[in-house]
Amino acid sequence: MKPVVSRGVGRPYLAMSMKPIHRLLAAVFLAFTAAAQNGDKTNEVQRELVPRDIIPPAPVLTPEQEARTFAVAPGFRVELVAAEPLVHSPVAMQADERGRLWVVEMTGYMPTPDGTGEQQPSGNIVVLEDTDGDGRMDKRTVFLGGLVMPRSLMLFQDGVVVAEPPRLWFARDTDGDGKADEKVMIADDYAAQDDPRLGRKANPEHASNSPTWALDNWVYSANHAWRYRWLGGSVTNWTKEPTLSRGQWGLSQDDHGRLFHNSNSDPLRADLVESRYLARNPDLRPGFGANVQIEKDLRVWTARVNPGVNRGYQPGQLTPEGKLATYTGACGPVVYRGDQFGPEFTGDVFLCEPTGNMVRRERITNQDGLLTATNAYPGAEFLTSTDERFRPVNLHNAPDGALYVVDLYRGLIQHHIYLTSYLRKQIESRGLQSPVDMGRIWRVVREGRPVGRDRLGAKPTEDELVAKLSHPNGWWRDRAQQMLVERRATGAAPQLRKLAGSGDAAPLTGRLHALWTLEGLGELDLATLATALDDPAPKIRGAALRLSEGFLKGPQREAAINLVLQRAGFVPLEEQLQLLLTLGEIRTPATEAISRVLLMNAAPSQLRFDAVISGLAGREVDFLASLVQDPVCATMKNGHAPLLAGLARCVALGGDPAKIARLLDLAAMPKPGDWQQIAILGGIAGTVPVAKPGQPAPVVRPVRFPTEPKAVAQLRTVDSTEVKSLIARVDPLLAWPGKQGMAADAPAAAALGGDDAASFARGTELYTVVCGACHQPHGNGQEGLAPPLRDSEWVLGSEQRLARIVLHGVRDEISVKGVNYLLNMPALAEALTDQQIADALTYIRREWGHAAPPVKEATITAARAATAKREDSWTQAELLRIP
């Protein structure tokens, strides 16, 4: 059989398919057109903006016909790897070292317009093989069936880890017939919105997915606030700990272990530093370096008109030509780490936009640790299609070095929860509601360059795996490291140490993987780290600094500290960020002094500022005092103002009166109106939410002093308009007996008892599983994903408004603590019972020092009854009309 090929012509285009969420939508289109849809907004006019005579039909195409609709960047071609009936409804895949493809089939996605039957066990994990070597898969084996909406998989040991939220399974074949006969559970809480034990229904847009074995030997996931690590022995012997919830659908890492992710309208974010560092200081809210938006240009360049997007009737959603204007379904990012495209592509990110039938290539640049993503083809895309049914949902690296595209080939991709009447009409007008059981997998290759043919047998030797750690294709390096760690291949430790310390005699990536493989095996030693700290490559030295932290809690702590401090005097900028992070783990006066010197002798950088602040929990005011008294800092002027402001902000958020009084003393020390004074006061003022006309008054939790701090009166006399303005902003935060206009202390909230205490306890569990992934355990929310709940006027105010927010969701712009958020919260009316909603709301109204009254089940029941006919989410304006 000959591969179906599409050769690139003209402008570069590639279409990628969308998240699993979209399959739910297919069935929705079959419902009666005149009926109001879940995604409709009250009184909203849904006018068709694209003339029907310019909208082409959308017939079902054969793979050969679909291939002819592709326009790919010059020098590339698109080859068919698999198609129905060999594969159905694919949403994710992984290649293995033998060249087989393990594919997730989410065949239960939206079997009817209202999703009826979606919870039936019809999903599969299938294994596809190319038995004749022609590049096209020709053999299908159902490895594991009977799954309910499976999302993704990860190769592990002699089987696979399967994400079937809320369960995470391990399955393997023990008798050699290619079908799983052992299936054991690793976790039963692998989801935020899909847990039958708690009465929640699935929302495919917000279920955990994409478990990824990262460079640091932890397994991270998209849309999930926990990371996992295998402890050896049994395949179910895992530990887990909280982490940042990343993105929505899809997760990838680069050669240095940095994680990349995205969400529908936010095409690319990255963790520039490991997120656990920023979590060290609970008052660093939010720290800069994790979940950083690295692509800010949201425009897309599709190959066809795109009226079939959910808000296509809104001005600005489509261009005047009727094409998609900005991202609305970004998903499935992958950092290209193969060797088939050529070195100039290594480290670039490819991502899907299925509603626009395209794939973007983002060129990644690094300047002093800051990553920036830009479209590699300005005004065009890497791959596009004129076939409206081309829906790539995921992208993957593979052992042959090519780029694989998972195409959920169908017309309907929007979930019925968000479906609008407009989109339903679009679907029905072109017959896009069926079929719903097709699917293709494509391979993008660069012409004129060989495609990798490397393979390993069923039981590769340790020597073979160690050799693969230096392979030019990152897929092989990752796979070899994971397999060595899974085997507990301690016998390979001497080879790994030799590779790690080989300097320029071996590839940088090979040395890096050798170090992390030793860490995963528990065979890393200080001698190896000492050698790595002298490596010619800053990336290796930085990794060695990070790895030294594993010795700080054991008997070799002092020796590890000495190794780190030996590097402190001559660290180039490329390595300095990691040194500052590691010094924050050591936490001694000496390391803080080193951090101060490093900051004062380098260009201002928010990354470095927050790296230091993250390691100063509880000691920010001491560090700030050392800066104010440092003559070098005094000459830095505004370049280091964010550092002083950030430290002051943390002290203010900590709420300790003694530390805040000292902070005010420090603010009064510099010359009146000096930049240091303004920076410190600005940091404090930034913690006080600003009231906005027509919006709920933000909650200000004052800090109570026994008497008026002396520095306050001194600062009020400063002859500076800016200082006077800042003092006025800070004033609501400061309280003391007899202060004019200050209300008397509110009586302490009575401890919850009886039914209320039980409700709070249940709410604690619900929050962890349902809410915490987005709003985070600390309640401070996440940039680009969820606003804060801690001290939120919406949480502590009207329980009638709060009940409606949870029942029906919120859309469009909403102000929280003086900051505007343009984010959509899904409705939970069908997902949670009245008692569960009351429990969760009681928790957030009494956690984090809150003292609002608990919410009763009857309150939610009454709110549900009063809004029984409502099918729309709420806007801020509507909520403000509710007492």
Task: Show the residue positions of the predicted features.
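Detector for the c-type heme attachment site
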Residues: 446-447, 775-781, 807, 811, ...
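Gly/Gly-Pro-rich "capping" loops immediately C-terminal to redox-active cysteine motifs
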Residues: 427-429, 781-817, 822-834
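Flexible coil segments in periplasmic/lumen-exposed cytochrome c-class electron-transfer proteins
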Residues: 41-57, 746-758, 816-823, 827-883
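Long, ordered, helix-rich scaffold segments
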Residues: 406, 427, 431-438, 444-765, ...
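The canonical Cys-X-X-Cys-His
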Residues: 395, 406, 441, 763-777, ...
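Sequence/structural segment immediately N-terminal to covalent heme-attachment motifs in c-type
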Residues: 680, 756-782, 795-808
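Beta-propeller domains with acidic blade repeats across secreted/periplasmic ectodomains
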Residues: 37-465, 475-476, 483-485
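Sec-dependent signal peptide recognition
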Residues: 19-27
